[in-house]
């Protein structure tokens, strides 16, 4: 009886560990894919540094991190739609362009390229990124 327990106990523990790591490994691969696609985003480095910081922070907090959390909950058998993420990234460039326009030449109440224009332009930017997250979330699974 003791010999049987000596063999069965390690096998049971190994099986439990294997079952626990399987979803985590899939989640890890989904997260890694989303992050890899987001690393392809390149904003124009010639723009003001405080603007770039605000733009990147918005993308990170309103879109990338929520998508990573969402993709992390996928089952191992779920396929991640790369096309969906790539479409979202293309839309990011459009939203960032609108944000930059409000910060620069379309700024009405302050000097263009000023911190005041940035603060004024930031009102709409996170909202649009949040809406993009909601749309992307719907098509993320193939």
From Swiss-Prot:
**Which Gene Ontology molecular-function terms are recorded?**
toxin activity
Q: List the disulfide bonds.
A: 84-139, 107-117
Cleaved signal peptide residues: 1-26
Compartments in which it is found:
Secreted
Its primary localisation, in coarse terms, equals secreted
Give the keywords, sorted: Complement system impairing toxin, Disulfide bond, Secreted, Signal, Toxin
The domain of life for this entry's organism is: Eukaryota
> Which Gene Ontology CC terms are recorded?
extracellular region
Write the protein's name.
gSG7 salivary protein
Q: What does this protein do?
A: Salivary protein that moderately inhibits the alternative pathway for complement system activation in the host.
Which InterPro entries does this UniProt record tie to the protein?
A: ALL3/gSG7_salivary-like_helix
């Amino acid at each position: 009886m003791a010999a049987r327990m000596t063999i069965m106990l390690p096998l049971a523990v190994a099986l439990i560990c294997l079952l626990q790591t399987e979803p985590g490994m899939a989640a890890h691969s989904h997260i890694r894919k989303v992050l890899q696609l987001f690393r392809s985003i390149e904003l124009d480095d010639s723009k003001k540094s405080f603007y770039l910081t605000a733009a990147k922070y918005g993308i990170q907090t309103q879109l990338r991190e929520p998508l990573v959390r969402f993709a992390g909950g996928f089952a191992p058998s779920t396929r991640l739609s790369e096309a969906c993420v790539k479409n979202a990234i293309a839309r990011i460039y459009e939203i960032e362009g609108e944000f930059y326009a409000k910060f620069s030449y379309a700024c009405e109440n302050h000097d263009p390229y000023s911190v005041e224009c940035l603060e004024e332009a930031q009102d709409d930017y996170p909202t649009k990124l949040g809406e993009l997250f909601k749309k992307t979330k719907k098509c993320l699974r193939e």
